[in-house]
UniProtKB/Swiss-Prot annotation:
This is NAD(P)H-quinone oxidoreductase subunit N. One of its GO terms (molecular function) is quinone binding. It comes from Nostoc sp. (strain PCC 7120 / SAG 25.82 / UTEX 2576). Its EC number is 7.1.1.-. It is found in: Cellular thylakoid membrane. The keyword Iron does not apply. GO terms for cellular component: plasma membrane-derived thylakoid membrane.
Length: 162
């Protein structure tokens, strides 16, 4: 890999496909460089982990309920013993509302994406067609060098056969 990477190939493929699956070296550091390149190209990035997402479609595009960690404490009311449900606005919608005026769009950078099911990855693949200002980068695994391909090409072989 070159010492100085411009990231133009990733940006070009992200604009072409709308969503890409990346394979990053396990020692890390590369995602920060590429996120910086995306911000320099005019995108706003939002990074979060795939662990604990639950329903990806509801989390990103719909109002969804969350419960804070109960830390061993129980509520004494008639509700659930693990605490109240707090409803949060859709992440994508609220982030798009607050984009700077000259921004090209929002890039969702999802780390630990290897734990996502193929149905969840399929939704993430279709998300840029539902909202054209949203691009998706999912870390699908590790590799010796930083590489990427279209997210639809990262489905498991058993899912592609269906």
């Amino acid at each position: 890999m070159a010492l100085i990477t411009t990231g133009n190939g990733l940006i070009r493929d992200l604009e072409k496909f709308g969503s890409v699956g990346v394979y990053v070296p396990l020692e890390g550091g590369f995602e920060g460089r590429y996120r910086r390149r995306l911000r320099a190209a005019g995108y706003t990035t939002l990074q979060f982990t795939a662990r604990g997402l639950g329903d990806v479609a509801a989390y990103l595009t719909g109002v969804h309920g969350v419960r804070p960690p109960h830390l061993g404490k129980k509520s004494s009311g008639n509700g659930a013993a693990v605490g109240n449900v707090y409803y949060l606005p859709p992440i994508v919608g609220s982030q798009l509302e607050h984009l700077p005026p000259k921004s090209k769009g929002l890039v969702l950078w999802i780390i630990e994406g290897h734990i996502l099911s193929d149905q969840e990855v399929e939704f993430l693949t279709s998300l840029p067609s539902l909202e054209p200002r949203v691009k998706v980068v999912v870390e699908r695994g590790g590799d010796r060098t930083f590489r990427w391909k279209a997210l639809k090409d990262t489905f498991s072989a058993s899912y592609q056969a269906v």
